[in-house]
Structures are given as structure tokens and as C-alpha cells.
Amino acid sequence: MYDQKRLRFPSSPCDTKFCDLSARPKRFPIVPSERSDVLRALFITLSESRWLRAVAEHSAVGQKVSSRFVAGTQLDDILRVTQAANQAGLTVSVDNLGENVTNAEEARASVERYHLLLDEIAARKLNANISLKLTHMGLDVDAKLAREQVAGLVAKAASMSPRNFVRVDMEGSAYTQRTLDFVHELHRVSGNQGCVGAVIQSYMRRSENDVEKLLAEGIRIRLCKGAYKEPPEIALQKKSEVDANYIKLMKLLMKSGAYHGLATHDERIINEAKTFATREAIPRDAFEFQMLYGIRRDLQQSLVHEGWRVRVYIPFGTEWYPYLMRRLAERPANLWFVAKNIMRR
């Protein structure tokens, strides 16, 4: 098992136990499902606080806590972590953290970092692709600029040998339709097929219809649960409903014949996927499980040892606060690790 925090490979039982977020002291019991929805709403609200973000991102404690979930702030940091993950049998999707840039200069700087990433991935022969947000590429500033910038990255990925891949992340519901339209548009460009993909959130009520349209064109999908604050008329509010829809959509993806990513740390859902794959004679290399950097590393390695494909979503950069809050919203059990890091200050 590799230690994603400092690129060490822990060998002691203590290190291994520390990596397993399921190993909690009795005084920190697993959060009951009836309280998970409340905590989820709380962390989503906190993710939108500009004041808390400014305080957290400039505090020593905040930076220490974020190191569990974020590879570092520099390009060299993410490249070292990616190489370590590859050596542990994991593929990677790299995300340069950021969203909702406010000017064209920020947007151009963001896309330039992604061009450098693609160059370094190729030069170092890393098994990694890139994930990005359209608002980080300037969608709020100039939609045409954002489209041109991402189109350039997809064209570059498609021209590489071996070909690489660009995942366009999903953001809040205000961006859902524009994001999907853009992915469809990029996919239809000659030579881009298989080099650009979308993200579908199972808590969105519209997701089944979106999945059907994406599958009709053979567009690769990452399926996740969703971690933005949305009203009941747009998104499912109960965890049980979100999980049930995830499983329903997951089976559609697995039977489609295209290569998709199942992004979850939920062992019940993972076991359901494994059982379904066996029952339907779906090969283990026909899809991949996707997990977040710093979360359930024991499970990542267990799946790899069983012969399943696992991709780790590894972010880097200084704008980590919204990302961390959304990870706590998705999995309130991660709060134990945050508390432990603060106490170890």
C-alpha cells in the first residue's frame, strides 16, 4: 500500500491502520444514516463560504488537513504522487484545483497548466489523464474562450501517442446543460472520439435521461453521487434515494459496452458492481472503479489485488477548500481524519 501523503510505502501495521478510515476509536462511532443527510447539507453550505475559505486556505492547520486529500501545490508534487500511484497498480486522473475564475488571464493560466501536465504525463510515461471544470477554464467570463481552451486540450490529448483523455467535471446544476452540450459537441469533432468524457451525478433527477443521450453517442461517463447544494425539485435529498439511483445508472453503464468509471467508496455499491459484472459476464477490464486521493486506500489496493481496475482522482493546487468541504459532504466519516489531523498539530 502506498502512502499518498508523503509518497512513502507504509509497512508497519500502525501505518496501515492509519490509512484505513474505517478504523475509528469507539468514541468516534460511524455516523448513522439518519444524521448523514444533515451533515452533508452542513458541509455543502460550508463549501460556499468565502470567508471560511479565505481563513482555511491561509492557515497552517488548514494546509495540514488538506494534505490528506490534495497532493500538493506544485506540478512536481502531482507528478511524484502520480508516479507512486502507478507503481502501486493504480491509474490516475489529475485535477488542477480551481473553479469560477473571474478573468481571462486566470483562465489562460489554468489551461496552460493542463498543457504542461499533458506534456509531462507523456514525457514520464505516466498512466494518467486529466480532469477539469469549465468554470476553471473561464466559462463564467467568456463561454467562447472556455470552449476554445478545452477544445485545444482535447485535440492535444487525441494527438498524443498513446492517446490521452480529458474528463469534463460536472459542477452545480446551473452548469449542467451547458457542460453536457459542450461534451457532446467536442465528442463529435473528428478524431476526438474516446478522448473526452462527461460526469453524471446520481442525485440529479435528470441523470437517467442524460445517461441515455451520452450512451447513444458512445461517450465515456464517470458516475458519482454529487456534492453540490441543490433544491429538492432538481436533486434527490435522501442518501438512500441517491444510492438507489446510482446502482440503477451503474448497471446501465456496465451493460453499455463502453468504458466507464464508477466513482464511489461505498463498499455495498462496489460489491453490487462486482456481483453484477460476474452475473452478466462483464470483463474486469471493461470498466474501472474510481476513488479519491486519500480516501479508502486500503480498499483501492484490495480491488487492485483482486484484478479490478482502479483510478485515483488526485487534485493539486492551492484552491483546496471547496474541494475538501465537498469530500466531507460526500463522506461525513472523513471528518474523523480531519479532527485527528487537527489534534496532531
Q: Where would I find each of the regions flagged by the language model?
A:
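Low-complexity, intrinsically disordered or signal/transmembrane-proximal segments
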Residues: 2-4
